[in-house]
């Protein structure tokens, strides 16, 4: 798999990650603007786009995350196009999550106190023609500068890329996860239990249009849709299930 590692000069966590990745001999494509404000035309062609990035939240909780970019609604205030999502590689996202968790639990890193989780689809860029993922250090400036946090992600990234390039990973069902909160706790747990390769994730609060449902089921390879049954409003459940049934798309409660 050909891949492009991308770092933004505006992002301190991204620059921290870039330093560590380059220390291992990997090349990084540098951009001058925010990663979320970029688009497909600004990058060389690749089979996978991997953005080295910060994660910000009001809680400032130490968190390491991985997610695919995309806007599930008309709101594109954080880059990208309205109601558009970039393609997703569920194997990459899940192996990356598992590897971050593995390193995070090692004795030399455990005291840092980081959580490891997925995030749902959000922000740009949304028009990429190949799978993409953001790998992130969060959630405040203090964490963005931590070398050991960058080392966890760098080692996880190297292990993930090596596994994919050498086809050294087990065959498992690939799923799309619908429902739950922003950090998708249900699907994070399923992935860490190594039950599935989890790709696209959407939250309870997003009202998914037919346009988005069509993109979810056409831009990622998947075996079935996993529905967090308690993590959706009843009205939305009925709408989504009706769409899946009408289009012969397999789904399961999880």
UniProtKB/Swiss-Prot annotation:
Catalytic activity, as annotated: a D-aminoacyl-tRNA + H2O = a tRNA + a D-alpha-amino acid + H(+); glycyl-tRNA(Ala) + H2O = tRNA(Ala) + glycine + H(+)
Gene3D superfamilies: AF0625-like
Protein keywords: Hydrolase, Metal-binding, Zinc
GO BP field: D-amino acid catabolic process
InterPro entries, A to Z: Deacylase_DtdA_archaea (IPR018033), DtdA (IPR007508)
EC assignment: 3.1.1.96
Compositionally biased intervals (Polar residues): 65-74
Start and end residues of each stretch annotated as Disordered: 61-82
Manner of cofactor binding, per the entry note: Binds 2 Zn(2+) ions per subunit.
Cofactor(s) needed: Zn(2+)
Subunit structure: Monomer.
Cross-referenced HAMAP family: Deacylase_DtdA (MF_00562)
NCBIfam families xref list: PRK03995.1-3
Designated name of the protein: D-aminoacyl-tRNA deacylase
Species this chain originates from: Methanococcus maripaludis (strain DSM 14266 / JCM 13030 / NBRC 101832 / S2 / LL)
